[in-house]
Amino acid sequence: MDKYAVFGNPIKHSKSPFIHTLFARQTMQDLEYSAIEAPINGFVESVTAFFSQQGKGCNVTVPFKEEAFQFADQLTERAKLAGAVNTLKKLDDGIILGDNTDGEGLVQDLLQYQVPLEDKHILLIGAGGAARGVILPLLKQNPASITLVNRTYEKAKQLAELFSPYGRIEAKKMSDINKGFDVIINSTSASLSGELPQIDPVIFSGGAISYDMMYGSGKTIFNQWALKNDAYQAYDGLGMLVGQAAESFTVWRGLRPGSKQILRELRKT
């Protein structure tokens, strides 16, 4: 039986084994998927041991995505630009391929909700690893523009410059934002810390779609704020989690599983 896993620390909370077990059942693939808590300073040793013991592929979550980027022998274009890897696959020749499926997970979730991205004005809040991983897939949807804002403007500016060859993207200071957008994506952990970005809620005016990469049992704090300020609709990041998992599964098995049923199951728990 082919072995797969997710590496992280902590990892007990991970929904990945549940998701991939359902994907395997749905696509009739014979595999096992486990959660492995690697020591903070022992990711390389743990993942090397996993691949030497017939491991076929793995997901990587915090805090090891940058280490996985360094560990991979070969990188996809989206992983190179993301600067982080969340999916490793052992190829037939023993080469370890590093990929990043986070952005594809976000885009697929937005499209599943029938959120149009082409020719739309997108505001991306945050300039950390989560933002960096989704910019290229968003640009590939041909939006009219992506505006990047961050608490530290310089970080947003550097990220906008990195991705400028791939599409229309610019960085702005939060204090300079004074208009509405079509789609607002929050890549910060604001909802977990109970804080809100220091930005004018006018961004939601005119029926914007709000998307928070965080998720919880109810509406996230960011999405509550969005709806209170005239956002048309608000979605959390649980579908992105399922979407990136589906993309990883496709990378490993060459089959794309359906996400809707799994998302329904997760909403029940």
UniProtKB/Swiss-Prot annotation:
Its EC number(s): 1.1.1.25
Catalytic activity: shikimate + NADP(+) = 3-dehydroshikimate + NADPH + H(+)
Keyword Amino-acid biosynthesis recorded: yes
Membrane-spanning residues: none
An example molecular function term from Gene Ontology annotations: shikimate 3-dehydrogenase (NADP+) activity
GO process terms (BP): amino acid biosynthetic process; aromatic amino acid family biosynthetic process; chorismate biosynthetic process; shikimate metabolic process
One GO term describing the cellular component: cytosol
InterPro entries reported for this sequence: Aminoacid_DH-like_N_sf, NAD(P)-bd_dom_sf, SDH_C, Shikimate_DH, Shikimate_DH-bd_N, Shikimate_DH_fam, Shikm_DH/Glu-tRNA_Rdtase
Active-site residues (renumbered): K65 (proton acceptor)
Binding site for NADP(+): E77, G126, A127, G128, G129, A130, N150, R151, T152, Y153, E154, K155, M213, G237
SUPFAM superfamilies: Aminoacid dehydrogenase-like, N-terminal domain (SSF53223), NAD(P)-binding Rossmann-fold domains (SSF51735)
Pathway stated in the Swiss-Prot or TrEMBL entry: Metabolic intermediate biosynthesis; chorismate biosynthesis; chorismate from D-erythrose 4-phosphate and phosphoenolpyruvate: step 4/7
Keywords: Amino-acid biosynthesis, Aromatic amino acid biosynthesis, NADP, Oxidoreductase
Binding locations of shikimate: S14, K15, S16, T61, N86, D102, Y215
Similarity section: Belongs to the shikimate dehydrogenase family.
Quaternary structure (record): Homodimer.
Role noted for this protein: Involved in the biosynthesis of the chorismate, which leads to the biosynthesis of aromatic amino acids. Catalyzes the reversible NADPH linked reduction of 3-dehydroshikimate (DHSA) to yield shikimate (SA).
NCBIfam families for the chain: aroE (TIGR00507), PRK00258.1-2 (NF001310)
Record-given protein name: Shikimate dehydrogenase (NADP(+))
